[in-house]
Each structure stands twice: as C-alpha cells, then as structure tokens.
Amino acid sequence: LQIHLDTGSTGENGFLSVRHKENDQSLDADKLALITWWDGQEKVQSGEVSVKAGWEIVQESDKNGFTINCSHAGLGFSFRFELVINDSILIVNIPATDIKETEKNKLKSIRPLPYFGAANEGEEGYLIISREVGALCYYNNKEPQEYKLPVYNVNGIDMPLFGAVRGTAGFAGIVTSGQFDAQFCINTNRDENRRYSIGPEFDLRSFKDEDLTAEYHFMPTDKANWVDIGKCYRHYNFKHRDIVPLKQRIKESPELAYASLAMEVRLRLGVKPVPYEIVEQTLENEPAVRVFLTFEKVRDIFDEFKSQGIKEAEFCLVGWNKGGHDGRYPQILPVEPVLGGEDE
C-alpha cells in the first residue's frame, strides 16, 4: 500500500489517501474521526476530530504505519489511533485502554475515518452492504440520506463486513474488534459533494474494554468487485476464525453429510393466538393452543414423502412444546397434549 497522511497540523482538516500498489486510483478520507458525546447537561453533542475544532493531534511514524494521539483539553477527551500497514491491509485501531474522559462530558460514539473511499453521484461503482443475502448500492439516483444499521441486530446485518468499489479501486472492510457495539453508517447522495460512503461507528457506553478495530483489505484492479470482496471475507474467516468449510466437515460427520443433501421441511404444529389478546399470561388465563398439525398427521406426511420417492429430508417440528409456538416458555415440557402428547 502507498499511504499519505496529513493530520491537519496547519488547521485544515486531516486526510488520508491510500492506494494499492497495483492500482492507479486512490481512496481517501477527509477527516480522522467524528464523535458524539453527552455534555454536562446530558445533551448529545457532535463534532469532528481536527485541529481547527480545538484538538491537539500528534502524529508519529514507524516502519509499520502511524500512531496518532488525539486530545481535547476543553472537552476532556483523549484517545489514540493506530494505523498499521500489513501488505495490502490497513488496520485502523483505537485501543480501549487509551480512551480517556477527564471532564463531565461522556463519549457516546467514535466514527473513525468517516467517508473513507467516498464516491460522488454518477461515479462507476457501488457500496457493499452485508444485509441478509447482501445488497449493492450504486452511486446514482438515491435520496440524500444517512442510514445507521447496527451489526448483529434485527435489521439483518449478519456480518461485520462492508465494502466499496469505486472505478478500478475497492476494499473489503471487516470490523475485527468491537463489532458487537458497532453500526454501519451509510451515506447516499449527501452534502454538497453528493457523496456515497459506508464505514463503522462504535458505541462506547456499553463496550467491554474491547479495542475498536477495522481492517481495510485493498483489492487489486482485477479483483475490485463484490464477488472478490466476498471471497476476501471468506478467506479471512478461514484464516483467523478457524472456520472449516462444509465440504470438509461432512467427511467426519455422517449426520452433516446427510443434512447437506436433504430437503428441509418446516412443519408448524401448534401456536397461541397472535397478536396477543392477553399480554400477561398465566396458567389460569392462557388461551387455548391453535392446532395446525397433530403428531398423527406428521406421521402421515412422513409416509407420503416416502411414497413419493423422497429419500432424504430433514423435518423441523415447530410448536411441539407445551403451549405450542410462543407457548409456555421457558417451560417446554411436557409435549403439548392437544397435539397427541407423549403417547403420540
């Protein structure tokens, strides 16, 4: 990687420019960080980390990258950036032990390198969003908006993966520490430059002394696409998380080998009425279970599968427990009597 860093010692915004050695196009960030905090009146404030915003920023260089110490005497905040270069990977790390608060203000969030790799309206490329099966956001005709999607939450962000392709340049971003307190900030057609960008923001009040770390894997020109960015994350999991591919795991597990070939069939047996008419349910007032399938009917389905020549199938029985689906949790036994009970 070829990196140019200017922390804005003259009063201008700091910026970072990164270029893969096999690519003529660089990806840039025009700010070191954005932060939010609660002031002494418990009101949320926000600002950028820059010299012109009153921060003292001290940059040091070594053979592996840069260390940037940031402090603001008036706000009472200080923390340290580590930018580590490892071949074609830029590791951005904020050590948890170096995040300090010395005044009444309390840090709420830190967003390192906001708008890194941002593209403008109409440029060739797209953002990569790891929502459910995956999404691409092209740089055209989007509403001016900022979205914040927490990682591992109900919105479907199932992986700490993000990325961007801009012309012939691209990166795979992986949040490797602090991911459980992270969210992806997605900007579309924003501000006067009509920018598109994606990157992590870390919430601080509930974090468990974890470093805040994101790795940017820069792609060579012929691999600056969403397919190879996905492969990059796959290889990362193999190397660093000891994840074994299914085709290797089935060699030692007959059950898994069977499941890999079998049709999955979900059978819904019993449920309680939804939406709930009785919110606080007890043994005395809980509603009756609505029956969709009894255990006897389940056996009939098994027999029909066999008669139709379906040899491999895995059946998931939903709502077999006491009270059915959304039943008498945490109590699941005995088996629901109206479905046939223990005898069936």
PLM feature spans:
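Acidic/aromatic-lined carbohydrate-recognition and catalytic surfaces
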Residues: 319-344
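Carbohydrate-recognition beta-sandwich/jelly-roll modules
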Residues: 1-314
